[in-house]
Amino acid sequence: MTENNIDRISNIIRTQDILRRHDFNFKKKFGQNFLTDHNILTKITQTAELSKEVNVIEIGPGIGSLTQYLLEEAAEVMAFEIDKSLIPILEETMAPYDNFTLVSADILKVDLLSEIQKFKNPNLPIKVVANLPYYITTPILMHLIESKIPFSEFVVMMQKEVADRIAASPKTKAYGSLSIAVQYYMEASVAFIVPRTVFIPAPNVDSAILKMVRREAPLVEVEDEEWFFKTMHSSFVHRRKTLMNNLQAAFGKESKPEIEKLLAQAEISPTIRGEALSIEEFAKLADALLPLKK
């Protein structure tokens, strides 16, 4: 299938026609906003740097606007769609492609490891490329990142504010537990901004394409990974409070003397705030506080 004879569905007239014919109604609970801009879709595909030696997982394909572009560049695309009313639409729009697999399921509830074995060549690198539902962006991302599946790269659209938080540096307003949780595993950067005007229906905020590349090993080495995340999350519960106040709230007031002693030994100020600590400093903090683990 060449560029000249591809029946593009990524324009507002074709999209509206497809939705009208199938009597489709947008469902707010699924956060549905369909892209209708050829240039943006091309840019997303280019950012993903696909080839016929790469498989793709897509979440929330909608009517398949982005899916078309992915299928032309990747070996295979496996798309997960939770909205049953979109299944007949996708079966129609993706009919010309033999490298497309549609899974009618919630990405958070499927056995993803079993599903990816259904790729014709499951040993190829797998990238996640998707316009993620805004209402559940973070749970989906963390579910995929923390899974045992070695996704090599993510190129995903989300609210600009969330993308900024994930890619944020220490001592910035956007920096927080989400920044560290993702950057521990992935190198994250905002690739480009997507205006709200290129969707139907238009969302209330602008979006961003976030590119995340999996690190060969976590960014920092810690003695206890679960404890590292618990300590880190505890430090951000109340952003305006000091590290000591947050840690006391997490581990109990009676633990204050021991926390003070452990922080002093690690040369970490109890009056600093969580957003001022780098991921390396959080690793040092977590290891220092390990004696508090019950």
From Swiss-Prot:
Q: What is its EC number?
A: 2.1.1.182
Q: Does the keyword Methyltransferase apply?
A: yes
Task: Please report a single Pfam family linked to this protein.
Answer: RrnaAD
Subcellular localization is given as:
Cytoplasm
Spell out the molecular function terms from Gene Ontology: 16S rRNA (adenine(1518)-N(6)/adenine(1519)-N(6))-dimethyltransferase activity; RNA binding
Is RNA-binding among this UniProt entry's keywords?
yes
Q: Which SUPFAM superfamilies match?
A: S-adenosyl-L-methionine-dependent methyltransferases
GO cellular-component term (any):
cytosol
Enzyme class, first EC level, given as a word: transferase
Q: Where does S-adenosyl-L-methionine bind?
A: N33, L35, G60, E81, D106, N131
Keywords associated with the record? Cytoplasm, Methyltransferase, RNA-binding, rRNA processing, S-adenosyl-L-methionine, Transferase
The protein's matches in InterPro entries, at most eight in alphabetical order, are given as:
KsgA/Erm (IPR001737), rRNA_Ade_diMease-like_C (IPR023165), rRNA_Ade_Mease_Trfase_CS (IPR020596), rRNA_Ade_methylase_Trfase_N (IPR020598), rRNA_adenine_dimethylase (IPR011530), SAM-dependent_MTases_sf (IPR029063)
Its recorded reaction(s) are: adenosine(1518)/adenosine(1519) in 16S rRNA + 4 S-adenosyl-L-methionine = N(6)-dimethyladenosine(1518)/N(6)-dimethyladenosine(1519) in 16S rRNA + 4 S-adenosyl-L-homocysteine + 4 H(+)
Known role:
Specifically dimethylates two adjacent adenosines (A1518 and A1519) in the loop of a conserved hairpin near the 3'-end of 16S rRNA in the 30S particle. May play a critical role in biogenesis of 30S subunits.
Q: Write out the similarity annotation.
A: Belongs to the class I-like SAM-binding methyltransferase superfamily. rRNA adenine N(6)-methyltransferase family. RsmA subfamily.
* HAMAP family to which the protein is assigned, alphabetical: 16SrRNA_methyltr_A
Protein known as = Ribosomal RNA small subunit methyltransferase A
What species was this sequence derived from? Lactococcus lactis subsp. lactis (strain IL1403) (Streptococcus lactis)
Q: What is the lineage of its organism?
A: Bacteria, Bacillati, Bacillota, Bacilli, Lactobacillales
Encoding gene (name)? rsmA
